[in-house]
Amino acid sequence: MKKLNLRQLKEHLYHGSLQDLDFSNLTSSAKAWLEREIKRIEEMKFYEKKLYEEGLNFIAGVDEAGRGPLVGPVVAACVILPKEIFIPEINDSKKLPEEKREKLAEVIKKEAISYGIGIVDCREIDEINILNATLKAMKKAIFEVKEKIEYLLVDAISIPDMPIKQLPIVKGDSKSISIAAASILAKVERDRIMREYHKLYPQYNFAKNKGYGTKEHIEALKKYGPCPIHRRTYVEKILKG
């Protein structure tokens, strides 16, 4: 039987599992990569494993996408993963190319015990500010989850008035597999929304810039003015300057 190379191994892992994998049927480079990946992902389970050892089962990661853009909503996700989950190449969404994020999002949705998405639009961001909008989106995502969450691992910030115990982790999307999964779902959902907005307002090229303040986007903003989904509190300074 011909041994699986690295590309074939990754495809197998996306659609199968470690349990049904014959390690002797891997090329040396594929086996070396897999050993490194297993070690990396086990390190990303550090916080989850500590909580499992305390007898908890439903641990959720929470993260957001869209605090920085000039346009559109802030999107949060909340994800509970199984204890023995192995998703190759899962990481902070910002470290992954778009195509990889899309593929990983499909796997996460399929393998997750439960997940939720929360969205707060640009109008509300202008009304309550981006931090409060982010917290509101996170709460929405948490309450969308079907299982009873026992503990929250949150990227960087603490969520006030939350009846569930939580731990904010700085750069949590790189340190916790649950937060990484949430970061990917939030980013993929927000990118999908921005592609839809691009169809309505193609002059700003939202499909490419996703609403961030690129040079091209700012030039279009100055040329055409803001559209209905621009965050007024963000673009006023740019237009005045």
From Swiss-Prot:
It comes from the Bacteria. The keyword Hydrolase applies. It is found in: Cytoplasm. Endonuclease that specifically degrades the RNA of RNA-DNA hybrids. It catalyses: Endonucleolytic cleavage to 5'-phosphomonoester. It is an enzyme of class 3 (hydrolase). One of its GO terms (cellular component) is ribonuclease H2 complex. A divalent metal cation binds at residues 63-64, 155. CDD domains: RNase_HII_bacteria_HII_like. Residues 57-241 form the RNase H type-2 domain. Its cofactor is Mn(2+); Mg(2+). One of its GO terms (biological process) is mismatch repair. This is Ribonuclease HII. PROSITE patterns: RNASE_H_2 (PS51975). It comes from Caldanaerobacter subterraneus subsp. tengcongensis (strain DSM 15242 / JCM 11007 / NBRC 100824 / MB4). InterPro entries: RNase_HII (IPR022898), RNase_HII/HIII (IPR001352), RNase_HII/HIII_dom (IPR024567), RNaseH-like_sf (IPR012337), RNaseH_sf (IPR036397). Its main location: cytoplasm. Belongs to the RNase HII family. Keywords: Cytoplasm, Endonuclease, Hydrolase, Manganese, Metal-binding, Nuclease. Its EC number is 3.1.26.4. GO terms for molecular function: manganese ion binding; RNA binding; RNA-DNA hybrid ribonuclease activity. Manganese or magnesium. Binds 1 divalent metal ion per monomer in the absence of substrate. May bind a second metal ion after substrate binding.
